[in-house]
A protein has these predicted regions:
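Alpha-solenoid helical repeat scaffolds
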Residues: 1-2, 32-39, 71-75, 105-109, ...
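Juxtacatalytic substrate-recognition/specificity segment
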Residues: 16-23, 57, 91, 124-125, ...
């Protein structure tokens, strides 16, 4: 029956299916062995049976009855992968490998199960599948998909041709030919390949689903949604098309229809994990607070919205003014921004599934999702830098109609982070220097592939850095206007490499000139420092270290280790000298364990507070995400009553973690010290969300400040809250007597909308 399906002989396939169904219904006891249970399970799925019941009553039972048959493991894995239940698929396939280690299908499925979590093992499994069968069509098709993701369209076509040489009727291969034509702006080719792929009616809806899915994976959500709608016209109950359309719509900001579709799929198929996750998330989003300003709709946890929601709106407004103007973009409004205190919720909203631990934020064009500092532990990233980065994606994606390669989109966003604040974004480091000089640079013409299956997390971060370096190179050598013209070319469908050639002469020349540029930048990093990896002295004593240091006076690792050894001995003066030398040679170094970090400890132990202050100021000017030196500097500034510096630095701490009480307390102290009563409103409002020891005092102070700021209604509310907590609070009683019943509303306050995520 499956063979007839693949050969596009649906009538003969249906005859067999009906015959199988008749036999099972007549004598079910004859088909209760493990192998036949799997066949019956597949039959029920084809007839629209409940996937969860098929899994439990057919596949699981077959596996229990005979763990040594591979049929149940493969069937379970295929169903789990369709539902994106990668954990179940992986556990099932690991058993299958033990039973049948020479089956290419097992390794192909294993590669798909491993893909989201272990790219290296996934690639190895794919290679094993082709080693066992060079003509394994599913594997060849999957390779074509990956090459499309890397924008290696010629190579992808070669894989598809190999598939079609074996099976000229392979609908999915023809569908991917249509995808490539679409991405290359070949509309006639797209239509031709689509027509061929759709000539077999039983897979007609699948063809549109496959094309739409791949386009959405390339961030072409509008085109992807159009294809899913076509699929649903042909098959209104096509579950995969419905849930994909739901996600497309949610990523386009069309939330009402998107949530309705997710709910419908969840009711239709309770084993659809993405639908279940989305419906569950929608219920949690109902408890979020919604803020609006300047074309932005921001959803946040209610408590967090009170603490720093105003800062989010202000940051987004600044980013809009700067970046939309710079790139000549009139935004399509509204821009949705959703900030999640739970990383799992962020992942589900973004990807449909838990995971994505390395992502701080994601932009789809008009929708931004981001992790709040609450989801990131003790050392969160600078959320202002994250939102600036993601909003830059809004600008460039909208300018290009989502038709830009990932490397250019990420490169511009990182570049603009650096332009906005020297401590944001990425800069050349010792690790990046080693990659560049060690021939780890990816040619510009192949950069999109650097983001797929990088060999390590460092290499993924380097892909972002290299992309920003390409943008910097283009702006320095060809100008910002040329970069904007490239974006304009992309918006009308011109391939990136063709556009680059228009302005740089040739891709080969661009690749070579950029490599020279990057290598020159790497070599210019700390030119007086020796970065070679030398063996440190075997004997850990003062004499051995001094002798080793004299023989290798300016070695990067050596100076660091030499200083660290003296610090272990608590010989602070001896540790200071090599650290000063490191800072002299390599002031750009902000990697973990850098000279700033070590020397700050030394200076504090020595009690040289003025020198420590200067060092910490130099450090935070280069690193926009490091929290401990900022906290220490706040202590120093407060001790010295440098209130202007306290105010400025506390704002910097809030850009990293606004959920800490101490920067709000410092802002409050600075405002009190300078007699700026109105400026106490923001820190007092935030601190009241952090379970203060004396809430009555804070409510009273806030009421007093609000009255001074011309907000008597809010002042009355808070003075009443003060009296709720402390009924005999004399100052609060006196303030209540002063308040009139009439109060003007604050025109600057964010407009709060309904909590429903559908609005």
């Amino acid at each position: 029956q499956r063979a007839y399906r693949h050969a596009h002989e649906p009538i003969r396939a249906d005859i067999l299916l009906e015959e199988i169904e008749r036999l099972v219904n007549q004598t079910p006891w004859r088909y209760s062995d493990p192998v036949n249970r799997v066949i019956v399970g597949r039959l029920f799925l084809l007839r629209g049976g409940d996937p969860r019941q098929v899994l439990e009553l057919a596949y699981d039972r077959a596996q229990r009855d005979n763990p040594n048959i591979i049929d149940s493991s493969i069937a379970t894995a295929e169903l789990a992968l369709e539902k994106q239940d990668y954990a179940l698929a992986l556990s099932s396939l690991e058993k299958a490998v033990e039973v049948e280690a020479d089956n290419p299908l097992v390794y192909f499925l294993l590669s798909r199960a491993l893909g989201p979590t272990d790219p290296a093992r996934a690639a190895a499994a794919l290679e094993k599948a082709l080693e066992l069968n060079p003509n394994h069509l599913l594997t060849r098709l999957f390779l074509a998909e990956r090459l499309i993701d890397q924008e290696q369209y010629d190579a992808a076509r070669e894989q598809l041709v190999q598939v079609l040489q074996v099976n000229p009727r392979h609908s999915q291969a023809w569908a991917y030919m249509a995808v490539i034509a679409h991405l290359e702006n070949d509309l006639s080719g797209e239509q031709a390949w689509h027509t061929i792929a759709s000539q077999w009616p039983e897979e007609d809806a699948d063809v549109d689903y496959w094309i739409g899915l791949k386009l959405s994976q390339k961030y072409r959500f509008t085109e992807g949604a159009t294809y899913q709608r076509r699929a649903l016209v042909k098959n209104p109950l096509h579950t995969r098309a419905r849930i994909q359309l739901s996600q497309d719509l949610l990523r386009l900001g069309k939330e009402k229809e998107g949530w309705q579709l997710a709910d419908a799929v969840n009711q239709q198929d309770q084993y659809d994990i993405v639908a279940h996750n989305l419906v569950t998330l929608r219920d949690r989003l109902a408890g979020f607070r919604t803020l609006e300003r300047d074309g932005f709709i921001v959803r946040m946890d209610r408590r967090e919205a009170t603490i720093y929601g105003e800062r989010v709106l202000a940051l987004l407004s600044r980013a809009r003014q700067s970046l939309a103007t710079k790139y000549d973009v009139i935004l399509r409004e509204p821009v949705h921004v959703e900030i999640f205190p739970d990383q799992r919720d962020f992942a589900i909203r973004t990807f449909g599934l838990p995971g994505g631990a390395g992502f701080l934020g994601v932009c789809f064009g008009s929708v931004i999702t981001a992790n709040s500092p609450a989801s990131q532990g003790d050392q969160p990233s600078n959320w202002e830098a994250v939102l600036w980065h993601e909003f830059c994606h809004v600008v460039t994606l909208q300018k290009t109609n989502n038709k830009m390669p990932r490397w250019l989109s990420e490169g511009i966003s990182v570049y603009e982070e650096n332009q906005a604040d020297a401590g944001w974004g990425q800069s050349m480091s010792a690790a990046y220097r080693e990659i560049i000089l060690g021939d780890g640079l990816t040619p510009v013409s192949q950069l999109s592939g650097a983001f797929l299956a990088p060999p390590s997390p460092l290499h993924l971060q380097f892909a972002y850095f290299e992309s920003s370096l390409v943008v910097e190179y283009l702006v320095e050598n060809y100008g910002l206007e040329t970069l904007k013209r490239i974006l304009q070319d992309l918006s009308v469908g011109m391939p990136i490499n063709e556009s680059l050639q228009r302005y740089t002469g040739s891709l080969k020349l661009l690749d070579q000139e950029f490599e020279n540029y990057a290598r020159a930048r790497a070599k210019s990093l700390a030119p007086g420092l020796d970065f070679s990896a030398l063996e440190l002295p075997e004997q850990q004593d003062a004499g051995s270290w001094i002798a080793w240091q004299q023989a290798h006076p300016d070695n990067y690792l050596g100076l660091t280790a030499y200083a660290a050894w003296w610090m272990e001995q608590e010989k602070w003066d001896q540790a200071e000298k090599p650290l000063r030398r490191l800072l002299e040679l390599f002031p750009e170094d902000i990697a973990s364990g850098n000279a700033y970090q070590l020397l700050s400890i030394v200076l504090r132990e020595q009690g040289t507070t003025e020198q420590e202050q200067q060092l910490l100021e130099d450090w935070i000017a280069r690193d926009g995400e490091i929290l401990p030196p900022r906290v220490r500097l706040l202590e120093i500034y407060k001790q010295n009553e440098n209130w202007a510096q306290v105010d400025q630095l506390a704002q910097s701490v809030l850009a990293i973690n606004p959920l800490r009480p101490d920067p709000h307390e410092q802002l409050l102290a600075a405002a009190h010290a300078r007699g700026e009563k109105i400026r106490t409103i923001e820190p007092l409002s935030a601190l009241l969300e952090m379970s203060p020891v004396d809430p009555a005092a804070f409510h009273y102070q806030l009421a007093d400040a609000l009255l001074a700021g011309g907000q008597p209604k809010l002042a009355r509310r808070h003075v009443l809250r003060a009296l709720e907590n402390a009924p005999r609070y004399r100052q609060a009683q006196q303030l209540l007597l002063q308040l009139s019943d009439e109060a003007d509303q604050d025109p600057a306050a964010p407009v709060e909308k309904t909590n429903s995520p559908e609005n």
